[in-house]
């Protein structure tokens, strides 16, 4: 069994924009995020994009048995209790900074619940752990795709964070 590893942490591989905006923040200093900060409308909810260079070609047509996601989280957001990340297919297989955040959001792949606050956490997806998300991501990557989108459509108060920021 072979292993493929890819990281999304560069200026052309990770970033976010508000759903209704084409102003992108890119690179590992910004990351990919979802939810809203001082965003009282759906257009201000963040869309995060992660591109795993080489994944499309390396995984197309392969039989994927497990996916491990190592996620580094900042201390931003509503706190250290459990949060839910919502993953989507990407409408572009690149970090297309010439479009609004909304243009990147494809069909929903599923959700992942964990302690995503000021830490690095690894979640393993397979047929017995996070099975629904694994099945959707497996099919998506086996079809030759290499980008994932984080988006949950949450809004927040004018002075705070949304629940799953």
Regions found by a protein language model. Name each.
Residues 1-56, 85, 89-93, 155-159:
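Flexible, small-residue-rich N-terminal segments that precede or flank a structured functional core
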Residues 4-6, 44, 135-165:
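Proprotein-processing/basic-patch segments
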Residues 43-47, 62-64, 143:
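Short, surface-exposed loop/turn motifs at beta-strand boundaries within globular domains
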Residues 52, 62-76:
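A short beta-strand element within beta-rich, extracytoplasmic domains
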Residues 56, 68, 73, 91, ...:
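A mature extracytoplasmic/lumenal domain signature
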Residues 56-63, 136-142:
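Surface-exposed acidic, glycine-flexible loop patches that form ligand/cofactor-binding
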Residues 73-146:
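Beta-strand-rich interaction/scaffold domains
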């Amino acid at each position: 069994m072979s292993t493929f590893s890819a990281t999304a942490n560069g200026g052309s591989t990770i970033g976010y924009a508000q759903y209704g905006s084409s102003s992108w923040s890119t690179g590992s200093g910004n990351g990919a995020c979802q939810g809203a900060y001082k965003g009282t409308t759906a257009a201000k909810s963040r869309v995060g994009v992660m591109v795993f260079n080489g994944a499309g070609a390396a995984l197309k047509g392969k039989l994927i048995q497990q996916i491990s996601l190592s996620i580094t989280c900042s201390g931003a957001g509503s706190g250290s209790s459990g949060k839910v990340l919502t993953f989507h297919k990407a409408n572009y297989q690149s970090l297309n900074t010439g479009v609004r955040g909304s243009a990147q959001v494809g069909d929903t792949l599923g959700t992942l619940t964990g302690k995503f606050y000021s830490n690095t956490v690894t979640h393993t997806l397979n047929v017995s752990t996070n099975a629904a998300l694994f099945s959707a991501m497996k099919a998506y990557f086996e079809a030759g795709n290499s980008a994932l989108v984080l988006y949950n459509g949450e809004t927040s108060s004018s002075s705070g964070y949304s629940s799953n920021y």
